[in-house]
């Protein structure tokens, strides 16, 4: 299979288009390969063929479907080197960081096979009640640009395992790995069970509004998530949303600073901060504040010098504006060194020291290598500051006293709390956000069941 020509995949076949777009290499702004732009007719054909494939696919047993996912995982890993090169190119990653995504993503293909979809039976004097979980039908998976493979597979695998057919829509900034992923999948799955469409900004709304698509699963911005909710309401679609998170870390005064700071730095700057659960706001106890910030800046310098670019120019401009606004507001900016290749979408990683907690740069999610460090004097203050956000995706707590850290975690208004370790998702653990960070959960058994509809059958005696 060639990894330098790209097609939409409809009805199991590669499909070119009259119109194409080309991505941009974030390292040097050079144009990448042409990718076909799907039309409204392509959407109709993909949905129709998915509907036709659904009965036979949904009638397979859960075990049969997960065995095919395992087979696909094996085939995918045979081509891991090609996917590593593709991710490195379209995302601007180092080879090592590209490999992290490619190999970790395979775990999401395998995790459904560790579960069974439950059937619950209860009985009383009058009847037996049976609760089953059935596939929905056609699912549209709308994916972002920061981890195009892993986040796509995190939606594809549970949807297919539970008997649905999937139409994948990658970000127009990073279509290439998704197009190749689905092309490769045709060697394993029946035609039209898994399709992919790349297109302009009108493609997502076409899928969301389509009356014969039963569910939308989306990862991306809160603004787009809200629009999806509005558009999906017309047909009462099931919706799972994972949206923005202005994530907080709380560092208690009893931590071993020398042990904790390198872990914090690694989590902050991985993938140039383009991680949905990365820390954006760091609340540090006043007794260790100056030392912790100084050590964080020092520990970050080596990481910052080799930092990758922002994936696209649109996001780069947003981050540049955030830093400009912070500077104009008088915030103290600790720049961690200049990046080497100025031609690409590079930005200096920056620590904001003691910005006002209500400043725009603190309250908005800066999806990139910018972190605000703010001191607190009491646990109640730290918890209040951390919860002072419209979003609630993730948080972390650092303390030598695990019991104290757990008490803090219990009061944080977020979907995911990481104690004494950097934020990392786990395919076996439900993942979702509170407040405006999303609806529903992905991963684990609850994530699998989110692709099902529940049926209760009553057998009267």
UniProtKB/Swiss-Prot annotation:
It comes from Gibberella fujikuroi (strain CBS 195.34 / IMI 58289 / NRRL A-6831) (Bakanae and foot rot disease fungus). Induction: Expressed under high amounts of nitrogen via regulation by GLN1. Moreover, components of the fungal-specific velvet complex VEL1, VEL2 and LAE1 act also as positive regulators of expression. Finally, expression is induced under acidic conditions in a PACC-independent manner. InterPro entries: Ald_DH/histidinol_DH, Ald_DH_C, Ald_DH_N, Aldehyde_DH_dom, LUC3-like. Putative aldehyde dehydrogenase; part of the gene cluster that mediates the biosynthesis of the mycotoxin fusarin C. Within the cluster, FUS1, FUS2, FUS8 and FUS9 are sufficient for fusarin production. The other FUS cluster members are not essential for fusarin C biosynthesis. This is Putative aldehyde dehydrogenase FUS7. It catalyses: an aldehyde + NAD(+) + H2O = a carboxylate + NADH + 2 H(+). Its EC number is 1.2.1.3. Gene3D superfamilies: Aldehyde Dehydrogenase, Chain A, domain 1, Aldehyde Dehydrogenase, Chain A, domain 2. Disruption phenotype: Does not alter fusarin C production. Belongs to the aldehyde dehydrogenase family. Keywords: NAD, Oxidoreductase. GO terms for molecular function: aldehyde dehydrogenase (NAD+) activity. The active site is at residues 242, 276. NAD(+) binds at residues 220-225.
